[in-house]
Amino acid sequence: MTNETFSDRLKLAMQAKQFKQVDLIRAAQRRGVKLGKSHVSQYVSGKTVPRSDILHFLADVLQVDPDWLLAKDSTVNYT
Protein backbone atom coordinates (compact mmCIF):
# COMPACT_ATOMS: atom_id res chain seq x y z
CA MET A 1 0.00 0.00 0.00
CA THR A 2 1.23 3.43 -0.83
CA ASN A 3 0.50 6.66 0.98
CA GLU A 4 -1.22 7.80 -2.21
CA THR A 5 -3.63 4.87 -2.14
CA PHE A 6 -4.56 5.61 1.46
CA SER A 7 -4.97 9.27 0.57
CA ASP A 8 -7.20 8.46 -2.41
CA ARG A 9 -9.41 6.20 -0.35
CA LEU A 10 -9.58 8.66 2.52
CA LYS A 11 -10.73 11.36 0.10
CA LEU A 12 -13.33 9.00 -1.43
CA ALA A 13 -14.73 8.15 1.99
CA MET A 14 -14.80 11.83 2.96
CA GLN A 15 -16.64 12.72 -0.25
CA ALA A 16 -19.17 9.93 0.30
CA LYS A 17 -19.97 11.34 3.75
CA GLN A 18 -19.66 14.95 2.56
CA PHE A 19 -16.91 15.54 5.13
CA LYS A 20 -14.29 18.24 4.95
CA GLN A 21 -11.02 18.06 6.83
CA VAL A 22 -12.42 20.30 9.55
CA ASP A 23 -15.28 17.82 10.08
CA LEU A 24 -12.78 15.09 10.93
CA ILE A 25 -11.00 17.40 13.35
CA ARG A 26 -14.27 18.33 15.06
CA ALA A 27 -15.31 14.67 15.32
CA ALA A 28 -11.95 13.91 16.90
CA GLN A 29 -12.37 16.71 19.42
CA ARG A 30 -15.82 15.43 20.38
CA ARG A 31 -14.38 11.96 21.00
CA GLY A 32 -11.27 13.15 22.79
CA VAL A 33 -8.96 11.98 19.99
CA LYS A 34 -5.83 14.05 19.36
CA LEU A 35 -5.99 14.89 15.66
CA GLY A 36 -4.65 18.17 14.38
CA LYS A 37 -5.20 20.06 11.17
CA SER A 38 -1.67 19.32 9.99
CA HIS A 39 -2.14 15.58 10.55
CA VAL A 40 -5.33 15.46 8.48
CA SER A 41 -3.70 17.55 5.78
CA GLN A 42 -0.77 15.13 5.60
CA TYR A 43 -3.11 12.12 5.35
CA VAL A 44 -5.20 13.75 2.60
CA SER A 45 -2.13 14.85 0.64
CA GLY A 46 -0.56 11.39 0.84
CA LYS A 47 2.49 12.47 2.83
CA THR A 48 1.83 10.13 5.75
CA VAL A 49 -0.42 7.30 6.87
CA PRO A 50 -1.98 7.43 10.34
CA ARG A 51 -1.03 5.14 13.18
CA SER A 52 -3.44 2.34 14.04
CA ASP A 53 -5.61 4.15 16.60
CA ILE A 54 -6.16 7.13 14.30
CA LEU A 55 -6.81 4.82 11.35
CA HIS A 56 -9.56 3.09 13.30
CA PHE A 57 -11.01 6.42 14.40
CA LEU A 58 -11.11 7.66 10.78
CA ALA A 59 -12.68 4.41 9.58
CA ASP A 60 -15.30 4.58 12.33
CA VAL A 61 -16.22 8.20 11.66
CA LEU A 62 -16.34 7.66 7.89
CA GLN A 63 -18.11 4.31 8.31
CA VAL A 64 -15.67 2.29 6.23
CA ASP A 65 -13.52 -0.73 6.94
CA PRO A 66 -9.97 0.15 8.07
CA ASP A 67 -8.58 -2.50 5.71
CA TRP A 68 -10.29 -0.77 2.80
CA LEU A 69 -8.66 2.54 3.75
CA LEU A 70 -5.31 0.77 3.79
CA ALA A 71 -6.08 -0.81 0.40
CA LYS A 72 -6.00 -4.33 1.82
CA ASP A 73 -9.50 -4.81 0.45
CA SER A 74 -10.60 -3.65 -2.99
CA THR A 75 -14.30 -3.30 -2.21
CA VAL A 76 -15.64 -0.53 -0.05
CA ASN A 77 -17.68 -1.76 2.89
CA TYR A 78 -19.63 1.07 4.45
CA THR A 79 -20.55 0.10 7.97
Language-model features: where?
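Helix-turn-helix DNA-binding elements, focusing on the entry/boundary residues of the two helices
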Residues: 21, 37, 52-55
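Recognition helix of helix-turn-helix/homeodomain-like DNA-binding domains
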Residues: 30-50
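Short, basic-rich loop-to-helix N-cap that marks the start of a DNA-contacting helix
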Residues: 45-60, 76-77
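Alpha-helical residues within the helix-turn-helix
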Residues: 15, 26, 30, 42, ...
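Conserved hydrophobic/aromatic packing and binding residues within compact polymer-binding modules
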Residues: 10, 24-25, 40-43, 69
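Hydrophobic micro-packing sites on short alpha-helices
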Residues: 24, 54-62, 69-70
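Short, charged recognition helix plus adjacent turn
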Residues: 18, 70-79
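A short, Lys/Arg-rich alpha-helix, primarily the initiator
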Residues: 1-26
